[in-house]
């Protein structure tokens, strides 16, 4: 198997978890418009 694909998948799922947690936190969301979509 390709270790790079596994690492990329792990990183993507970590980012999803970060985004979910961060974007529900207004101060974090404001500081990370690139992952939270900005707009507010």
Curated annotation (Swiss-Prot):
> Cysteine amide: which positions carry it?
36
Its biological purpose: Alpha-conotoxins act on postsynaptic membranes, they bind to the nicotinic acetylcholine receptors (nAChR) and thus inhibit them.
Provide the propeptide boundaries.
1-19, 37-40
* Naturally occurring in which organism (per UniProt): Conus quercinus (Oak cone)
Protein family according to the UniProt entry = Belongs to the conotoxin A superfamily.
Checking InterPro entries in the record gives: Conotoxin_a-typ
Highest taxon of the source? Eukaryota
Q: Which UniProt keywords apply?
A: Acetylcholine receptor inhibiting toxin, Amidation, Disulfide bond, Ion channel impairing toxin, Neurotoxin, Postsynaptic neurotoxin, Secreted, Toxin
Which Cys residues form disulphide pairs? 22-28, 23-36
Q: Which GO terms describe its molecular function?
A: acetylcholine receptor inhibitor activity; ion channel regulator activity; toxin activity
The protein's name is Alpha-conotoxin-like Qc1.4a
Q: Species lineage, top-down?
A: Eukaryota, Metazoa, Spiralia, Lophotrochozoa, Mollusca
Which compartment or compartments is the protein found in? Secreted
Q: What broad class describes the main subcellular location of this protein? A: secreted
The record's Gene Ontology cellular component field reads: extracellular region; host cell postsynaptic membrane
The answer to whether keyword Secreted applies is yes
Q: Provide the domain comment.
A: The cysteine framework is I (CC-C-C). Alpha4/7 pattern.
Q: Does the keyword Secreted apply?
A: yes
């Amino acid at each position: 198997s390709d270790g790079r694909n596994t690492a990329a998948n792990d990183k993507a799922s970590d980012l999803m978890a970060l985004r979910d947690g961060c974007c529900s936190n207004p101060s974090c969301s404001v500081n990370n418009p690139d992952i939270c979509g900005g707009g507010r």
